């Protein structure tokens, strides 16, 4: 079994959902980012979703765009992010790790070379945010060749064909988007049809569903689980803690620890 499959099986046995924080790698620096990620795992994160710094992110709202800019301004490259991933994997051999990134970052390195490096540093899954199902072919094939699980997004306006395609092609987990738009901790409105989408994804045997976008409070984690999802992903709310504590790293780590503990408690 993959790390994601093992983790979901473990959580199911305990009747728990998954809490998965997102942060941008190398934000604000390589060393601080490593300490931040360690804090997330040590305080209860069930898996990690991590982003590479990129100057033109597709789905990212202002909070995560600012995180990208901080890492880029500090001079960090995609190779730095890969080295950081390797360091994280070395310390945490069991934690499932997924990447959320844009296709240009993969193109820059070359499809085969990128997925090969992901495998070398211990990445489990990759979600390419701007690759539609219709263009999935080479990505899915190359990912699987290197033992990387491809993940796809199910948008709130997905039709039957899209739902079926997402369910069929996703491995590890399925990313259910709460609403249209970009990531934000402020916009916590969710589409009204999420329960129907969850039912349909399950009917097509989709891998465990994680709900993302606008997950900032424990109540929203509980709400996601009540819809039948396997857990929730929180990006902007996590990164906002980093943003407001740039001048006080110890305070940043303390707030992140409390946040993860609180969000994880909501999965039980």
Curated annotation (Swiss-Prot):
GO terms for molecular function: tryptophan synthase activity. The keyword Amino-acid biosynthesis applies. GO terms for cellular component: cytosol. Keywords: Amino-acid biosynthesis, Aromatic amino acid biosynthesis, Lyase, Tryptophan biosynthesis. Pathway: Amino-acid biosynthesis; L-tryptophan biosynthesis; L-tryptophan from chorismate: step 5/5. The active site is at residues 49, 60. The keyword Amino-acid biosynthesis applies. It catalyses: (1S,2R)-1-C-(indol-3-yl)glycerol 3-phosphate + L-serine = D-glyceraldehyde 3-phosphate + L-tryptophan + H2O. Its EC number is 4.2.1.20. Signal peptide: none annotated. GO terms for biological process: L-tryptophan biosynthetic process. It is an enzyme of class 4 (lyase). Belongs to the TrpA family. Tetramer of two alpha and two beta chains. NCBIfam families: trpA (TIGR00262). The alpha subunit is responsible for the aldol cleavage of indoleglycerol phosphate to indole and glyceraldehyde 3-phosphate. This is Tryptophan synthase alpha chain. It comes from Haemophilus influenzae (strain ATCC 51907 / DSM 11121 / KW20 / Rd). The lineage of its organism: Bacteria, Pseudomonadati, Pseudomonadota, Gammaproteobacteria, Pasteurellales.
């Amino acid at each position: 079994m993959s790390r994601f499959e093992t983790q979901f099986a473990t959580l199911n046995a305990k009747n728990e959902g998954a809490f998965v924080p997102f942060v941008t790698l190398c934000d604000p620096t390589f060393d601080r980012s490593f300490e931040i990620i360690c804090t997330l795992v040590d305080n209860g994160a069930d898996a990690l979703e991590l982003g590479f710094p990129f100057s033109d992110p597709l789905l990212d709202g202002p909070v995560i765009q600012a995180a990208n800019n901080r890492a880029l301004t500090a001079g960090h490259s995609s190779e730095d992010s890969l080295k950081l991933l390797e360091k994280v994997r070395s310390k945490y051999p069991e934690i499932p790790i997924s990447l959320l990134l844009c296709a240009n970052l993969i193109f820059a390195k070359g499809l085969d070379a990128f997925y090969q490096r992901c495998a070398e540093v211990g990445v489990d899954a990759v979600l390419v945010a701007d690759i539609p199902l219709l263009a999935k072919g080479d990505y899915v094939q190359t990912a699987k060749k290197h033992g990387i699980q491809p993940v796809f997004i199910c948008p709130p306006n997905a039709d039957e064909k899209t739902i079926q395609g997402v369910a069929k092609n996703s491995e590890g987990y399925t990313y259910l988007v709460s609403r249209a738009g970009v990531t934000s901790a402020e916009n916590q409105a969710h589409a009204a049809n999420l329960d129907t989408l969850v039912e349909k994804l399950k009917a097509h045997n989709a891998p465990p569903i994680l709900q993302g976008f606008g997950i900032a409070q424990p109540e929203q984690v509980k709400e996601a689980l009540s819809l039948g999802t396997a857990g929730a992903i929180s990006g902007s709310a996590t990164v906002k803690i980093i943003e407001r504590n740039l001048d006080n790293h110890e305070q940043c780590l303390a707030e992140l620890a409390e946040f993860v503990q609180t969000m994880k408690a909501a999965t039980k």
